[in-house]
């Protein structure tokens, strides 16, 4: 593209950069599309692993960026985004623990902060025009920095396939580790990894062993169960097997332990925000254990009405997080409403891991409402069973009146 036909009005743009095929192509495309535009690469370290970050700065510079900021967000992600979300019990369509969805708000927020720091007038992402992430990122940008221009190359350029991107980079002598044989689209963070694309797009194809990366196949997991002891304080895991750990530290340990037992795999066809269905294979080993532990203590400490309210919050929260509406008054309100309930979730849980399953087999809490004296079927001095008669008569009064009226 000649200088005469290049777009103007953008002098400095911050790109959400991963070093993958898409964002590697975006850097030269931005330089060729916008006149005299400086590209700043931004990478969020959300626990995707050292292999994903190694050499990233050099790669961004060699692709044409003037600078690359790598921001460590691991602890903040777990403490300020994951824990508040799972405290509500949010789980999308009954199975998905929102791994990708929870990471998007903190990434977008940090990207805006870098844009402000360097004086950028635009932000850019590599999300496709068919997916949820474009909505999540741009919804966050709208809430946090409505003055910044948003550039979404997948909705602008003429490239439509991985082959197109590979050819584009080859023509410009930009190296990439991607290839047409690397068929899966993966997204990893401290909480999970997702796998999409390739043969997974046909729901009749069973995922091969090569799909999964965080967990062993349940049938190949140890033949003996492993018991993991967890201590919780106000809805957060503070100790794993007696060792005090940070929020991120606890999650990484549980990922390793639970992954070795094949825990946390799901294969689902979900309803995307943009209207289509998509198939995703997700691995959330440590998160599955954490979710089970919180729900186990909740069973002890929440009364019936509180638990029903928490379930309502969780159902609404799952949609807000999935749909990219984290920075909204409603999301803020639901998170605030869940805090008094989460503050009760303190205690100890023992989780049994075996062949892909994670079950709470022991639990106790100083806040427990469970009383063996009250619950026993044997003789007791604290509960007069005759009292139930009056309660049942009043509880069923509406049904009795309706039946009498029907005669």
Curated annotation (Swiss-Prot):
Pathway: Amino-acid biosynthesis; L-arginine biosynthesis; L-arginine from L-ornithine and carbamoyl phosphate: step 2/3. It catalyses: L-citrulline + L-aspartate + ATP = 2-(N(omega)-L-arginino)succinate + AMP + diphosphate + H(+). One of its GO terms (molecular function) is ATP binding. GO terms for cellular component: cytoplasm. L-aspartate binds at residues 128, 132-133. The keyword Cytoplasm applies. Its EC number is 6.3.4.5. PROSITE patterns: ARGININOSUCCIN_SYN_1 (PS00564), ARGININOSUCCIN_SYN_2 (PS00565). InterPro entries: Arginosuc_syn_C, Arginosuc_syn_N, Arginosuc_synth, Arginosuc_synth_CS, Arginosuc_synth_type_1_subfam, AS_cat/multimer_dom_body, Rossmann-like_a/b/a_fold. Gene3D superfamilies: Argininosuccinate synthetase, chain A, domain 2 (3.90.1260.10), HUPs (3.40.50.620), Single helix bin (1.20.5.470). It is an enzyme of class 6 (ligase). L-citrulline binds at residues 96, 101, 132, 136, 185, 194, 270, 282. SUPFAM superfamilies: Adenine nucleotide alpha hydrolases-like, Argininosuccinate synthetase, C-terminal domain. Coiled coil: none annotated. ATP binds at residues 16-24, 44, 126. It is found in: Cytoplasm. The keyword Nucleotide-binding applies. It comes from the Bacteria. One of its GO terms (biological process) is urea cycle. Pfam families: Arginosuc_syn_C, Arginosuc_synth. Keywords: Amino-acid biosynthesis, Arginine biosynthesis, ATP-binding, Cytoplasm, Ligase, Nucleotide-binding. Homotetramer. Belongs to the argininosuccinate synthase family. Type 1 subfamily. This is Argininosuccinate synthase. The lineage of its organism: Bacteria, Pseudomonadati, Pseudomonadota, Gammaproteobacteria, Alteromonadales.
